[in-house]
């Protein structure tokens, strides 16, 4: 947006940025939001929009820095639980995008883990903090060699089980399936250890059968269960 002889306000730049964002021109939209914030740096809400735009443009460094700036500047609602949750998700996305560099990936994922841990501390009965800690750990340990996500998925299930209706709700039902699948596969990998074989087979069947109760048409798990009989 070229001002020419006109004088544009922060609101004008925000409006144009919104138009560009709807067109998925996130780089250009970000430039407009930056101008808006330069004109009115009392509007901390612009920082949140700007961070989201950077994230959509996969500029995670700026997205994280800007969201942290938003959290520090928002004196009214500073450091709400949801802020830590959203910042954790940005860090998680950054970690996933940085898998070519283990060091960088781990840095972002550990930062995400720290954010989700705050969510758990402030809202211990909200399963989402546990779930996203599980996911961050799973990305750090993709071959399940260390089972980093195992205790975290177990904690997720413990929290979900506090409300029996969670197995009926679509969103939490998917979380159950995700956790059962991971824990079943983790135990399946333990069947190669003779000392743990029988216990691991039983645990695998338990988790995967629980998964099938919620997702009976899952052919992948149905076939995987058949392989257990040949072990």
Regions found by a protein language model. Name each.
Residues 2-4, 31-38, 68-75, 114-121, ...:
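Conserved structural position within tetratricopeptide repeats
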Residues 6-7, 41, 75-78, 124-125, ...:
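Short coil turns that delineate tetratricopeptide repeat
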């Amino acid at each position: 947006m070229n001002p020419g002889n006109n004088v544009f306000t922060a609101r004008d730049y925000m409006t144009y940025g919104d138009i560009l964002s709807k067109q998925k021109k996130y780089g250009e939209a970000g430039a407009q939001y930056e101008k808006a914030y330069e004109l009115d740096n009392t509007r901390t809400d612009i920082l949140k929009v700007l961070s989201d735009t950077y994230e959509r443009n996969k500029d995670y460094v700026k997205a994280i820095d800007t969201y942290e700036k938003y959290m520090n500047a928002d004196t009214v609602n500073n450091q709400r639980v949801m802020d830590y949750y959203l910042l954790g998700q940005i860090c998680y996305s950054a970690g996933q995008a940085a898998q070519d560099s283990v060091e960088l990936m781990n840095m972002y994922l550990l930062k995400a883990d720290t954010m989700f841990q705050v969510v758990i501390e402030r809202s211990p009965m909200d399963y989402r903090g546990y779930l996203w800690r599980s996911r961050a750990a799973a990305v750090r340990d993709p071959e399940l060699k260390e089972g980093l996500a195992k205790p975290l998925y177990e904690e997720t299930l413990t929290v979900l089980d506090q409300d029996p209706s969670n197995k009926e709700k679509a969103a939490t039902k998917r979380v159950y399936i995700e956790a059962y699948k991971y824990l079943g596969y983790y135990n399946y990998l333990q069947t190669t250890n003779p000392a743990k074989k029988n216990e691991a087979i039983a645990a695998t069947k338990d988790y995967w059968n629980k998964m099938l109760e919620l997702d009976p048409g899952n052919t992948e798990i149905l076939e995987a269960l058949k392989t257990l009989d040949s072990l």
